[in-house]
Amino acid sequence: MNYYGNYYGGLGYGYGGFDDLGYGYGCGCGSFRRLGYGGGYGGYGYGSGFGGYGYRSCRPSCYGGYGFSGFY
């Protein structure tokens, strides 16, 4: 439940990201079909990239993602 899952490259494990790694708290445009607290392209749940919050918020990078995304 880290607020800084993986901002920038999907280095996080189980936190999804640019490389769609695992699932959970994703960030930025990269988490494809990430359920739960994902984000990015097609990801729905909480979080996402550029201040995206709610469902299906596709924003590049992970700057101030609302919820559990990026390093808010």
Swiss-Prot record:
**InterPro entries on file:** KRTAP_type8/19/20/21/22, KRTAP_type_19
Cellular component GO terms, alphabetically? cytosol; intermediate filament
Per the record's keyword annotation, is Chloroplast included, yes or no?
Answer: no
- Keywords assigned by UniProt, alphabetized: Keratin, Repeat
Q: Which domain of life is it from?
A: Eukaryota
Q: PANTHER family attached here? A: KERATIN-ASSOCIATED PROTEIN 19-3-RELATED (PTHR38140), KERATIN-ASSOCIATED PROTEIN 19-5 (PTHR38140:SF4)
Q: Which family does it belong to?
A: Belongs to the KRTAP type 19 family.
Record function comment: In the hair cortex, hair keratin intermediate filaments are embedded in an interfilamentous matrix, consisting of hair keratin-associated proteins (KRTAP), which are essential for the formation of a rigid and resistant hair shaft through their extensive disulfide bond cross-linking with abundant cysteine residues of hair keratins. The matrix proteins include the high-sulfur and high-glycine-tyrosine keratins.
Q: How does it assemble?
A: Interacts with hair keratins.
* Name of protein: Keratin-associated protein 19-5
